From Swiss-Prot:
Catalyzes the transfer of the diacylglyceryl group from phosphatidylglycerol to the sulfhydryl group of the N-terminal cysteine of a prolipoprotein, the first step in the formation of mature lipoproteins. It is a multi-pass membrane protein. InterPro entries: Lgt. It is found in: Cell inner membrane. This is Phosphatidylglycerol--prolipoprotein diacylglyceryl transferase. Coiled coil: none annotated. The chain crosses the membrane at residues 17-37, 59-79, 95-115, 129-149, 176-196, 202-222, 237-257. Keywords: Cell inner membrane, Cell membrane, Membrane, Transferase, Transmembrane, Transmembrane helix. It comes from the Bacteria. The gene is lgt.
Amino acid sequence: MLIHPQFDPVAIHLGPLAIRWYGLMYLAGFIMFLWFGRLRIRQPHVAARGWTTRDLDDMLFFGVLGVILGGRLGYVLFYKPSYYLSHPMEIFKVWEGGMAFHGGFLGVVVAMWLFGRLRRRHWMEVTDFIAPMIPCGLAAGRIGNFINGELWGRATDLPWGMIFPQAGDNIPRHPSQLYQFAGEGVALFVILWLFARKPRPMGAVSGVFLIGYGAFRFAAEFAREPDNFLGLLALKLSMGQWLSLPMILAGIAMVIWAYRRQPGAGAPQPAA
């Protein structure tokens, strides 16, 4: 049995300014996105499509806005709509926590669609480009969750079960944040990076991301404690699982569509 180390959520104190670990993890995710993005631009089939470091920097700006706005609105709408309906001003207090990946994902899709319109690229060409780097941010975010001692798992008697004092019950639990780090972060990154090393039909890389994330998240939710204000929903599945199922189905549909359409695996596509 292990005990959560109880990290101080504030990593650095600079006078009245407190820099939190969770914010540093977001920063680490953005840095890894840029670093691996520059490596991706050097791949011959990617360079042939005219991607530049300026595109990458601009995509990060659009993506950050999509993550923050979509993640916050997703949390409000998917998890606590009644609370925020009664306390609308609380929606703007992003620094107090409360982000949802599925909302952030939708926000990024919209942001990449807008970016594609500005660059005259099809939105799926844009999402195909960024998909292999997204797990970097997911991995960093899950480490942030672990440092904060939040989003802990369900009770377990396994040797690596961990007591999270914030849970308030002194029961060993799955360190589900680390499971998600390993699945949604490390494993998904490896799968996507290897898959995207060769030219693929437009939409295929994005589809594999949807399938991979949805599957890893769906599996991890069996070890993660359901949100106490929601519990388990129909068929004893969590909200995270119900939101992941459409992602898996959409990903399968995109991969099938991409390979049936076969526009020429590496050919640039017109803007939509």
